[in-house]
């Protein structure tokens, strides 16, 4: 009986579409297979699953966490193929097509870009933007974890992943390259809103499901209660509320606030 956010809009005459990862998806496996086994059918009028090579992409493959062989390993690929040969370029293409096909009707579009989720795959030109040797690991204060339980001190630690100082530089470079690749695809979608004359009548939200540790507190990835893991990027663009344009807020907000705000 739960009505999801997109379903609420759909029930009120909006055409609702999903592109790529919105509900939970096994990455990289479901991207490689082009499936979305945890999707919620009543939420959408149309869906697009992305099928991309992920770590199987041609190019220079790197391994930044030699002790970790799980699906969350820090594999990287400086891909020799272009933007549109990878998941987020494909997702941007599908989102752009959705906007073109539905520009004359009320719509709700959820577009899930997968980078910088591991594997850290991006065309090589995005790696070229960064100097690996100049990467700086997060500074961790002495005794930072002395006041937390041992199970937390050892959870997803640098030692568990086997990340050396030199490997850490490569990991950061690959992470930043993945972000730049994703950011470029977001820009393509926003440019399409402008080209179609939709920007001034469209609410745009950019956010994520969690933050990420990249050596902060001598730890990696998510599932921590440190701010770097729980805090998410959050940009809300409402063209007709002009007084807030370009302003940041220090007020506490949560992702659960989105539903009542938009409803």
Go through each PLM region and give its residues.
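Formylglycine-dependent sulfatase
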Residues: 1-263
């Amino acid at each position: 009986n739960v009505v999801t956010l997109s379903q609420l809009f759909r029930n009120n005459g909006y055409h609702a579409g999903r592109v790529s990862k919105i509900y939970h998806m096994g990455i990289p496996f479901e991207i490689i297979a082009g499936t979305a086994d945890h999707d919620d059918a009543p939420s959408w009028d149309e869906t697009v699953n992305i099928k991309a090579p992920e770590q199987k992409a041609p190019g220079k493959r790197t391994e930044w966490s030699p002790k970790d062989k799980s699906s969350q390993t820090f594999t990287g690929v400086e891909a020799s193929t272009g933007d549109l040969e990878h998941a987020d370029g494909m997702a941007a293409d599908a989102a752009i097509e959705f906007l073109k096909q539905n520009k004359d009707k009320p719509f709700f579009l959820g577009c899930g870009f997968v980078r910088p989720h591991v594997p850290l795959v991006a065309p090589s030109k995005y790696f070229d933007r960064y100097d690996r040797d100049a990467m700086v690991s997060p500074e961790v204060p002495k005794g930072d974890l002395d006041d937390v339980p041992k199970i937390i001190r050892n959870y997803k630690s640098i030692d568990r992943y086997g990340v050396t100082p030199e490997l850490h530089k490569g990991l950061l470079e690959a992470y930043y390259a993945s972000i730049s690749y994703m950011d470029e695809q977001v820009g393509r979608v926003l440019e399409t809103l402008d080209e179609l004359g939709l920007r001034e009548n469209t609410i745009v939200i950019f956010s994520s499901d969690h933050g990420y540790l990249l050596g902060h507190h001598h730890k990696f990835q998510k599932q921590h209660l440190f701010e770097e893991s729980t805090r998410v990027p959050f940009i809300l663009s409402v063209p007709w509320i002009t007084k807030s344009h370009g302003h940041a807020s220090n007020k506490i907000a949560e992702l659960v606030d989105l539903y009542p705000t938009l409803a």
